[in-house]
Design a protein with these regions (language model features):
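Bacterial N-terminal signal peptides
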Residues: 4-15
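N-terminal (or domain-start) structured segment
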Residues: 20-116, 154, 162, 178-203, ...
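Hinge/capping helix and adjacent helix->loop/strand transition within the periplasmic-binding protein
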Residues: 22, 54, 81-87, 100-191, ...
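An extracytoplasmic/periplasmic, membrane-proximal ligand-sensing/linker region
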Residues: 28-30, 175-179, 263-326
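Short hydrophobic/charged patches on amphipathic alpha-helices used for structural packing
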Residues: 76, 142-145, 193, 212
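Beta->alpha turn/N-cap motifs
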Residues: 91-96, 159, 188-189, 206-211, ...
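A ligand-binding cleft/hinge motif common to bilobed small-molecule-binding domains
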Residues: 95-107, 167, 171-176, 203-235
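Short beta-strand->loop
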Residues: 115-122, 180-185, 202, 213-248
Length: 326
């Protein structure tokens, strides 16, 4: 009788156990970290040292998968619809919140929705900078605005894609200043920077990490930042707000997973990422790019992300419909 009850109990326990219970020993195979942009951009530059540190901590390979397209929507959708088992992660940028709002604006089905993801950790967060070629006559933001107003639509800015992390803050600036620039969208941060360095555009709005080497080499110049105060590494560069323009925008990168990833897997990834951001390669890589780490653990990150996404939804509505050329 007792033996029968024990067996019955085991059968019931097995029946109600979570589907992931048999695979508690995570990770047991390589992990893919998707970057929704080509190499050389903020997401890629953030992902690679983090992946290296995670490999050592988790004792499994962590492969970077660059899956570019549609300003990040292709890679974001890939992860949103992947099996939620912890083996497909995304190094997301701020644009992950923007693109579903753009789909709504244009009345089309979204490639993904933000609630298909859960945050593991925010890695960095930085204002964007208005960056121009050093061989232009613009030494200050006033120089740039005055010239742009004299010849609307002639100055070209490149971006990482329509409504991407480099496009949205430039639209905010154009609305706040009344200038009209011509837009050259590309497929990511790397191609965007190649465009300005190659003379195909004269300006970009980007986190300083993508521009720092070229600023130090004398090829590019910083005019203003989208924060509320000067950036520590460049105290001489004023904020748009301090110059009278209502432009405030934070470019961030964070590690996220499909929303139904088992809690025990998320915990392992949270703990590992918390340790990873303290590793030398992560600290050094951010220091070289003049980008401070701005780590947030999952709970804090998800709450912050919700508020940031709400703010960006309002920004998208204010920007309105923008076509591929302006």
């Amino acid at each position: 009788m007792l033996r029968g009850l024990v067996l019955t109990g085991l059968i019931v326990a097995t029946a109600v156990a979570p589907a992931w219970a048999a695979d508690d020993a995570y990770p047991t195979r390589p992990i893919s970290m998707v970057v929704a942009f080509p190499p050389g951009g903020v997401a890629d530059n953030t992902a690679r040292p983090v992946a290296t540190a995670l490999e050592r901590i988790l004792k499994q390979p962590v492969a970077i998968i660059n899956k570019a397209g549609a300003a990040g929507a292709v890679g974001n959708q890939t992860v949103a619809t992947s099996k939620p088992d912890g083996y497909t992660l995304l190094m997301a940028l701020v644009s992950i919140s923007v693109l579903p709002e753009v789909d709504k604006l244009f009345g089309r089905p979204p490639n993904y929705t933000r609630d298909q993801f859960t945050g593991i950790a925010r890695i960095n967060a930085d204002p964007s900078m208005l960056v121009v070629r050093a061989d232009t006559p613009w030494k200050t933001l006033k120089d740039f605005v005055d010239d742009a107003k004299k010849r609307p639509g002639e100055i070209v800015f490149s971006s990482s894609g329509l409504y991407g992390a480099a496009h949205v803050p430039m639209e905010m600036f154009m609305q706040a200043s009344g200038v009209k620039l011509r837009h050259l969208p590309t497929t990511g941060g790397g191609p965007m920077m190649n465009a300005i360095l190659g003379g195909h555009s004269q300006a970009v709005m980007t986190p300083v990490s993508l521009a720092v080497a070229h600023v130090k080499a004398g090829k590019l110049r910083l005019l203003a930042n989208t924060g509320t105060a000067p950036v520590a590494a460049y105290p001489e560069v004023p904020s748009f707000k301090s110059l009278g323009y209502d432009v405030e925008y934070t470019a961030w990168a964070g590690l996220v997973a499909p929303v139904k990833t088992p809690p025990h897997v998320i915990k392992i990834l949270r703990d590992a990422t918390r340790q990873a951001v303290k590793e030398p390669e992560v600290i050094t890589s951010h220091a070289k790019l003049d980008t401070p780490l701005a780590y947030m653990d999952a709970d804090e990150f998800n709450a912050w992300w919700e508020k940031d996404a709400q703010k960006l939804a309002a920004v998208v509505q204010k920007i309105g419909k923008v076509e591929s050329a302006q």
